[in-house]
Amino acid sequence: MTIKRTKDINHDTFRKAWRNYRLAPVAIAVSAVFMLSACEKSDETVSLYMNADECSQANPSQSEQCTTAYNNALKEAEKTAPKYATKEDCIAEFGEAQCTQTPAQAGLGTTTSSTSTNGEAQAQQQQSGSFWMPLMAGYMMGRLMGGGSAPSQPLFSSKSATSPANGQFVDSTGKSYGPATAGGRSMTVPKTAMAPKPATTTTITRGGFGDSVAKQSTMQRSASSGSTSRSVGG
């Protein structure tokens, strides 16, 4: 039996398919580069300072912007910092000499109960139209732009040994940005870290902010662990 070879094989089609196969890995690699670039653009480098003087020392030619960013962070802290009905509740969370009294903002509710047994003090604070909030321990500042103002966000820290925020820089949502140390330092954060935070509209119970810090820390560890696993496996 004789096997006949066909003369109708389209060699160009085979060569084209082979070229496409060889180009596929290249296309995937290029796509990966673009995806990595997109991820990089979603992060930005920020600086953490305790006060405007630290910023000015690190950026002598931009002292005015340092002060402006600091003052803007103070204003933001008044709106977004956790609020407490009593001084005792605030001190329990943040420590002695770490709290200040602030006028109640429009729309700030007072229905959230406190675990403090000093109900009379709570009623007096609510009647006086003021609440207690932690002092701003530092601020996070975006990149300084020539002639413009840098974005900033307030940071808080606790001196209470029982608080998850003890010795840490945390924002108003409870997210931690590492040790609250002097001298200034830089780090890379998601751009969402510099986005405006929602204004505080209710008082919180004693220990409530600490719970938020603990939850945020757990989420950060999980995200970091997941990222590492993908990098190793990928």
Swiss-Prot record:
Protein name per UniProt: UPF0441 protein plu3956
NCBIfam families tied to this protein: PRK11653.1 (NF008655)
S-S bridge residues: none
Family designation: Belongs to the UPF0441 family.
InterPro entries registered for this protein in UniProt: Biofilm_formation_YgiB
UniProt feature, compositional bias: Polar residues: 150-175
Region (Disordered): 105-129, 149-234
Biased composition (Low complexity): 110-127, 188-205, 216-234
